[in-house]
Amino acid sequence: MGLKPDKWIREKSLNEAMITPFCEGLVGEGVVSYGLSSYGYDIRVSDEFKIFTNINAEVVDPKDFNENNVVDFKGDICIVPPNSFALARTVEYFRMPKDTLAICLGKSTYARCGIIVNVTPFEPGFEGHITIEISNTTPLPAKIYANEGIAQVLFLEGDEQCETTYSDRKGKYQSQTGITLPRILKQQ
């Protein structure tokens, strides 16, 4: 399994629409950087957010998530409250090759401000926008800039294709658009 370079990412994105829209260079002046880098792709956060709130004194339950736990926000700058959390999505839409897994890590610009970004792996065959989890670990409000970089994606190509891809097993987040809240498959 090898880490894929910029040339591979560019070819997959331009020829197979692995990342759309795709930015061929790294954009970084006056913004939190995004676009193609040496061994990865810096994704952008869209202008749609779901900010966690405690106004209803609900318990967060991943098996029975109550949408009253979040407040929808759309704008160029999202303020994440102190010691709080927001969900967002990428500007980019991904179509993962059947032999490739992607891992996403937060950007140092935000990490150095106490903002932690968590994204689960992009499995082989996955398609959709990526839901991003943003934690403000500081005792102060934190700004998140829409349409700018939020995290870096690293692509790992397997030595061989897996037997069952995310799309083959009809993963519950397949083809997601927008910010997708937790889902649990119902027993039949």
Curated annotation (Swiss-Prot):
Binding site for dCTP: K107, S108, T109, Y110, A111, R112, Q152, Y166, Q176
Associated pathway: Pyrimidine metabolism; dUMP biosynthesis; dUMP from dCTP (dUTP route): step 1/2
Enzyme Commission identifier(s): 3.5.4.13
GO-annotated biological processes: dUMP biosynthetic process; dUTP biosynthetic process; nucleobase-containing small molecule interconversion
Pfam families: DCD
Keywords (A to Z) from UniProt: Hydrolase, Nucleotide metabolism, Nucleotide-binding
GO molecular function: dCTP deaminase activity; nucleotide binding
The reaction(s) this protein catalyses: dCTP + H2O + H(+) = dUTP + NH4(+)
InterPro entries in the cross-refs: dCTP_deaminase, dUTPase-like_sf, dUTPase_trimeric
Major enzyme class: hydrolase
Protein's job: Catalyzes the deamination of dCTP to dUTP.
Complex formation: Homotrimer.
UniProt record similarity statement: Belongs to the dCTP deaminase family.
Protein name: dCTP deaminase
Organism: Sulfurovum sp. (strain NBC37-1)
